[in-house]
Amino acid sequence: MSLACSRSLFFMAFTAGILALGASYYLEYAVGLVPCSLCLVQRLFMSVLTLCCGLAAVHGPQRVGLSLYWMVTLLSSLGGTTAAWRQVLFQSDSLQELAHCAPNPEEMFSSLPWLCALMRMFNDTADCAELSWTLFDLSIPEWSLLFFVGMSILAVYQLLRQVWMALQRPLSGQPSHPALVRD
């Protein structure tokens, strides 16, 4: 029962990620919105999250594999939450305080080491502070933040559930705590 439940949760998270990525590409190519550097970072984390959930749904791992997949999901959703939160903060700042020239991601990654390029993408730029599109009075980074926070909550809940199940039924078949002998 637990395996089927985990596979369906991974499949639902995979489907939500595909829909979110599809919406971002639709807004870029059909509507004409140009993504800023933080949007590209959020897409990267969302792609990792979606790929991880898709692999887990197909793979159907057991106890240790489930924990690893949920951990990767949690880490990628926390990275996306950080990028989305940073962009939401940029949108609340005044544009005069932000740098006016946004770094080109292709040039940065070709000329700088990866870590330096990622750090530079988190600098204040006016491109990331523009409110170009809203739905229900929420901007794209706010929707992205809601998605990543939801995925983080799901991953934390599933990891805590895995820990609880491991305490109740360890791999050896013996309870790990005397209070759980009643089982």
Curated annotation (Swiss-Prot):
Q: How is this protein positioned relative to the membrane?
A: Multi-pass membrane protein
Q: Where's it found, cell-wise? A: Cell inner membrane
| Swiss-Prot/TrEMBL keywords | Cell inner membrane, Cell membrane, Chaperone, Disulfide bond, Electron transport, Membrane, Oxidoreductase, Redox-active center, Transmembrane, Transmembrane helix, Transport
On the tree of life, the source organism's domain of life is: Bacteria
Which Pfam families does this one have?
DsbB
User: For this UniProt entry, which segments traverse the membrane?
Assistant: 10-26, 45-61, 69-85, 143-161
What GO cellular component term, any one, is given?
plasma membrane
Q: Between which residues do disulfide bridges form?
A: C36-C39, C101-C128
Q: Which InterPro entries match?
A: DiS_bond_form_DsbB/BdbC (IPR003752), Disulphide_bond_form_DsbB (IPR022920), DsbB (IPR050183), DsbB-like_sf (IPR023380)
The answer to whether the entry has keyword Ion transport is: no
- Share an example GO biological-process annotation for this protein: protein folding
Task: List the ranges whose topology is Periplasmic.
Answer: 27-44, 86-142
Show which residues sit on the Cytoplasmic side of the membrane.
1-9, 62-68, 162-183
A molecular function (GO) held by this record is:
protein-disulfide reductase activity
Report whether Chaperone shows up as a keyword of the record.
yes
Q: What does this protein do?
A: Required for disulfide bond formation in some periplasmic proteins. Acts by oxidizing the DsbA protein.
HAMAP family documented for this protein: DsbB
Family membership, please give it.
Belongs to the DsbB family.
Name of the molecule in the record = Disulfide bond formation protein B 2
Originating species: Pseudomonas fluorescens (strain Pf0-1)
Taxonomy, top ranks, is: Bacteria, Pseudomonadati, Pseudomonadota, Gammaproteobacteria, Pseudomonadales
Record gene name: dsbB2
